[in-house]
């Protein structure tokens, strides 16, 4: 079985082909970051238009990369949500049109389930069950995972996601969008403990997150350290970035440890754009070593949005016999716990 996967939920156009016998045989990705940087964030209308321009050429490139033709494809899957409705509709419309033309099944895939399954593409994939930390620009969730489709949300952000907090704080520090990587680069040059940020919601029970207060704390710290010209010196910028990042990482570490203790699990899977953060990876690895557990995450190229994770996740569900009709429907808001459980039905 060979599955074509299409990802268009936000500002990356991803197309990939997953082969049941050979694994991932094609992976094409186009990022719109440069286009949106001028606006300081993703412009939904521009994102949709760019997906229209890029998706079909990327499909052609993916087929070429895999040395396949349309006749070799056994199913088409696409991101149906969550995400920007216009962007989702582009991928959905193209995917379903191709499925109809090629007379193969089509299926909408949950974007965050795709992220959750991304580590399965690695040579040493995690075994079930595990706790998953899904951490991106739009989501921060801790999920109890017992199998494909067996999900329980243990905790999530009640306001800004971690990636969103990085971008907003980066903007306050004068960094261009998207600012997450740039904040981390500044943080590497920061002086530890010059500034101490709070660790939100760690002084009470529970596994929910809150990151919006850190942005406010950063703004107040910046304003309190401006020189007579209203500017921050470079070292102070680095020190604030360091304090902010350490607060986010420490908060995540505390919540992950609680989730593992609550479930009794020894495996932690981390996925999503922020999972590429070096400090977070280092500190999580240290925590899991102390707990005598294991941490898994995808290679950096599969941390951000991509077609590979969608193709693989769709493959799992199509192989299980799950399909949907050819109506064009997307779900900008979609709870992962609503997904069918295929863990005990041969998937």
From Swiss-Prot:
The keyword Cytoplasm applies. Its cofactor is Fe(2+). InterPro entries: ATPase_NBD, Gcp-like_dom, KAE1/TsaD, Peptidase_M22_CS, TsaD. Binds 1 Fe(2+) ion per subunit. The keyword Disulfide bond does not apply. Keywords: Acyltransferase, Cytoplasm, Iron, Metal-binding, Transferase, tRNA processing. One of its GO terms (cellular component) is cytoplasm. It holds the Pfam family TsaD. One of its GO terms (molecular function) is iron ion binding. Its EC number is 2.3.1.234. HAMAP family: TsaD. NCBIfam families: gcp_kae1, T6A_TsaD_YgjD. Required for the formation of a threonylcarbamoyl group on adenosine at position 37 (t(6)A37) in tRNAs that read codons beginning with adenine. Is involved in the transfer of the threonylcarbamoyl moiety of threonylcarbamoyl-AMP (TC-AMP) to the N6 group of A37, together with TsaE and TsaB. TsaD likely plays a direct catalytic role in this reaction. This is tRNA N6-adenosine threonylcarbamoyltransferase. It comes from Actinobacillus pleuropneumoniae serotype 5b (strain L20).
């Amino acid at each position: 079985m060979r599955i074509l996967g299409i990802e268009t939920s936000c500002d990356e156009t991803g197309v990939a082909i997953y082969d049941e016998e050979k694994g991932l045989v094609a992976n094409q990705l186009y990022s719109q970051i440069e286009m949106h940087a001028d606006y300081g964030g993703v412009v939904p209308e521009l994102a949709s238009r760019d997906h229209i321009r890029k998706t079909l050429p990327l499909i052609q490139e993916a087929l070429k990369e895999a040395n396949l033709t349309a006749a070799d494809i056994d199913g088409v899957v696409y991101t149906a949500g969550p995400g920007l409705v216009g962007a989702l509709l582009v991928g959905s419309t193209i995917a379903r049109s191709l499925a109809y033309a090629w007379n193969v099944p089509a299926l909408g895939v949950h974007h965050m389930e795709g992220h959750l399954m991304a580590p399965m593409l690695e040579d040493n994939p995690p075994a079930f069950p595990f706790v998953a930390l899904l951490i991106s620009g739009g989501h921060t969730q801790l999920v109890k995972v017992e199998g494909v489709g067996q999900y329980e949300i243990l905790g999530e952000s009640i306001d800004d996601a971690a990636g969103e907090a990085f971008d907003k704080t980066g903007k306050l520090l004068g960094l261009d969008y998207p600012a997450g990587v740039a904040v981390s680069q500044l943080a590497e040059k920061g002086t530890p403990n010059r500034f101490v940020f709070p660790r939100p919601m760690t002084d009470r029970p529970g596994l929910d997150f809150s990151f919006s207060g850190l942005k406010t704390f950063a703004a107040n710290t910046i304003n309190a350290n401006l020189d007579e010209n209203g500017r921050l010196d470079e070292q102070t910028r680095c020190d604030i970035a360091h304090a902010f990042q350490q607060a986010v990482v420490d908060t995540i570490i505390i919540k992950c440890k609680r989730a593992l203790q609550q479930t009794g699990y020894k495996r932690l899977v981390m996925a999503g754009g922020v999972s590429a953060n070096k400090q977070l990876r280092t500190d999580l690895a240290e925590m899991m070593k102390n707990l005598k557990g294991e941490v898994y995450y995808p290679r950096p190229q599969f941390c951000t949005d991509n077609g590979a994770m969608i193709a693989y996740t769709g493959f799992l569900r199509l192989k299980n016999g799950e399909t949907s009709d050819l109506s064009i429907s997307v779900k900008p808001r979609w709870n992962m716990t609503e997904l069918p459980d295929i863990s005990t039905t041969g998937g």
